[in-house]
């Protein structure tokens, strides 16, 4: 470095003009013309995030997925047709916005292309011009899915109930730095082949019965590389450029807060951060870009797979919620466990995610109940606690403290104005708002995209 530059002089030999640090600091605090709106599941998933995203995506310029893989499942109903999404952002339906699969997502290419083909058959068009995939995203291979099944089988009766989509093994490969990224596939194919064979050999050492036809897999992935190439970009700079241009950017969280690997009911969780932190790391965003955080809350609680569930119902009401709510997993096809709304849980996920508003879904499923219970706190070993247990052993032992509210015994399916809801339904919603200190801005009362109440202030 020259003496002139070391002394802070200008490039023409004159003294450099002092920067206005105050103005510079303000620009750092708010460097963009727009902020990101984030939609996150507030419970154990299946809250109806896809419907909310589809609604908000009609006004968005960019819709992003930031984490997870095809273990997630969203269903969006458009003109009576069910569009099922696992890897694709739900915003792909909007032909005016760009859909981004970010660096934090793990991508199973056979699943991605199959998903595109199935949705094309239902009417999805021109997606090639709207879908952008991060060059930094990691790839889920069939071998990861094979390993997922082998690991679950080894656990026997103590299995975690994973989707066996290979998500955990892929994130493990990422963490141990032998994972393979999109950029590897699109680079020197010889180098990609060597990395793939190395991954196969590692798993062969771990699992004696593990078998992969390496040659046929490499032939398949050479074809995938060319199909994928036109879709791949550096999504970090793309998202930042969109914000600098003042575009509306929407982020669709997959899974949900209680499945977050750090804040969920570990180990009965997924392998990514599906809370607000995953949005930042999964897209390369700094905290000051976050604007609205919409927590999607089902009017009752459901869970797929194993793990503690304090408000779970094992009676006819649980069966009624399952039947009326059509509670079968989009990805796993497993019946969802059902229980009462849990405010203690929602306060906890609200602390982690910082919800600025709530979308309450499936209110109509409660229409036939005479009484509705709501969990308001937990008691552990005889003492009322003001925190959410980090230990699943403790969570499995809590006693749930409920309040009971009257049901409304009227259909809400055709209601489109909050004031036209039965008074008891209005009370139920206001009770949730008052407890969480967060406004309910939307209420889902049916399956279709039009079956939603926009709550006006």
UniProtKB/Swiss-Prot annotation:
Its EC number is 6.3.4.4. Coiled coil: none annotated. GO terms for cellular component: cytoplasm. It is found in: Cytoplasm. It catalyses: IMP + L-aspartate + GTP = N(6)-(1,2-dicarboxyethyl)-AMP + GDP + phosphate + 2 H(+). GTP binds at residues 45-51, 73-75, 336, 362-364, 444-446. Signal peptide: none annotated. Its cofactor is Mg(2+). The keyword Cytoplasm applies. Substrate binds at residues 330-336. IMP binds at residues 46-49, 71-74, 163, 177, 255, 270, 334. Binds 1 Mg(2+) ion per subunit. Keywords: Cytoplasm, GTP-binding, Ligase, Magnesium, Metal-binding, Nucleotide-binding, Purine biosynthesis. Pfam families: Adenylsucc_synt. One of its GO terms (biological process) is 'de novo' AMP biosynthetic process. One of its GO terms (molecular function) is magnesium ion binding. Mg(2+) binds at residues 46, 73. The active site is at 46 (proton acceptor), 74 (proton donor). Pathway: Purine metabolism; AMP biosynthesis via de novo pathway; AMP from IMP: step 1/2. Homodimer. Plays an important role in the de novo pathway and in the salvage pathway of purine nucleotide biosynthesis. Catalyzes the first committed step in the biosynthesis of AMP from IMP. Belongs to the adenylosuccinate synthetase family. This is Adenylosuccinate synthetase. It comes from Aedes aegypti (Yellowfever mosquito). The lineage of its organism: Eukaryota, Metazoa, Ecdysozoa, Arthropoda, Hexapoda.
């Amino acid at each position: 470095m020259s003496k002139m530059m070391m002394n802070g002089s200008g490039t023409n030999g004159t003294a450099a003009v002092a920067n206005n640090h105050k103005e510079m600091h303000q620009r750092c605090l708010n460097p963009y013309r727009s902020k990101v709106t984030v939609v996150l599941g507030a419970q154990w998933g299946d809250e109806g995030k896809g419907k909310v995203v589809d609604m908000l995506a009609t006004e968005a310029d960019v819709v992003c997925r930031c984490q997870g893989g095809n273990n997630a499942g969203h269903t969006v109903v458009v003109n009576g047709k069910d569009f099922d999404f696992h890897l694709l952002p739900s915003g792909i339906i909007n032909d005016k916005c760009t859909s981004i699969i970010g660096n934090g997502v793990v991508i199973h290419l056979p699943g991605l292309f199959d998903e595109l083909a199935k949705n094309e058959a239902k009417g999805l068009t021109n997606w090639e011009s709207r879908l952008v995939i991060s060059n930094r995203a990691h790839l889920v291979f069939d071998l990861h899915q094979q390993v997922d099944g082998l690991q679950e089988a080894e656990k026997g009766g103590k299995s975690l109930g994973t989707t066996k989509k290979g998500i955990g093994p892929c994130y493990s490969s990422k963490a141990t730095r032998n994972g393979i990224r999109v950029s590897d596939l699109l680079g020197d194919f010889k180098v990609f082949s060597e990395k793939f064979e190395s991954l196969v050999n590692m798993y062969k050492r771990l699992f004696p019965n593990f078998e992969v036809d390496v040659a046929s897999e490499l032939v398949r992935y050479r074809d995938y590389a060319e199909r994928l190439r036109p879709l791949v970009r550096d999504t970090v700079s793309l998202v930042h450029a969109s914000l600098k241009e003042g575009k509306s950017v929407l982020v669709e969280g997959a899974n949900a807060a209680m499945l977050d690997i750090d804040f969920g009911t570990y180990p009965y969780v997924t392998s990514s951060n599906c809370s607000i932190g995953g949005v930042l790391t999964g897209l390369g965003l700094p905290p000051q870009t976050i604007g609205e955080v919409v927590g999607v809350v089902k009017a009752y609680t459901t869970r797929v797979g194993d793990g503690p569930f304090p408000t779970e119902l094992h009676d006819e009401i649980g069966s009624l919620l399952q039947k009326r709510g059509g509670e079968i997993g989009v990805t796993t096809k497993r019946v969802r466990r059902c229980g009462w709304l849990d405010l203690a849980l929602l306060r906890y996920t609200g602390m982690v995610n910082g919800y600025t508003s709530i979308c309450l879904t499936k209110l109509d499923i409660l229409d036939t109940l005479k009484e509705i219970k709501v969990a308001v706190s937990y008691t552990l070993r005889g003492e009322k606690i003001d925190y959410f247990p980090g230990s699943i052993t403790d969570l499995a032992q809590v006693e749930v403290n409920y309040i009971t509210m009257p049901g409304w015994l009227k259909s809400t399916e055709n209601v489109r104005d909050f004031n036209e809801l039965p008074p008891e339904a209005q009370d139920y919603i206001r009770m949730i708002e008052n407890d969480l200190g967060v406004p309910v801005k939307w209420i889902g009362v049916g399956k279709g995209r039009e079956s939603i109440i926009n709550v006006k202030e």
